[in-house]
């Protein structure tokens, strides 16, 4: 049975869901039952590749590309090594979406805040990050929730994937220059179809997903994101983990309302960029052989 051969491995809060919805329109691309299988970087991997294929891809037909859009793979050495093992005898391609690292970190922080899992302001959360990641070293989900700055160190993570799979197998997208401008967005979608060597189809790009939001009802958000009796009942009612994931996502969507996002203070943003990201971005620009213009 076939499974994924086209991976979007990052980055969270860089419009990966929007791109996923767009690519799902293409006749030569298979849509999985769940956008983020979260297979190669957590305990689901122990279920085996047959489980992965049967759970998410049992309805694959003759599409050229089969999607796995799990943007947390980029930060996982487990995922890197496991995908490398999985790749034997397969033609895999990768999509990576990058965004101004400070803006991505702040959007990530707002997402965790919305989920009711953050009680610090952004500055204090940054200061607490190293200690938090150490405390949660055996808890992948908590690490992903609180690694605001770490997940914006793109060169640190992407360079490893390039070493394993080769630069020519990656299509890298700059959110700030290729998604925010509609004409550049259309051109990027055209170039991506060429990269995948599929026919050029007219795809609707007027899609906005995972916009900055707040919870309508905080108690519902807390229930969705916490463990307890309700989670155990859900396991009894819904034997399939996939169905539980779909239900939780639907509840989250129903409980969201758009928020007015406050911009980061320009001086604070520049200080964060210079302190945490300047050196990494210079190495990233050298790796990609292009200027990213995030600090112009």
PLM features per residue range, with description:
Residues 1-296:
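Anion-recognition interface
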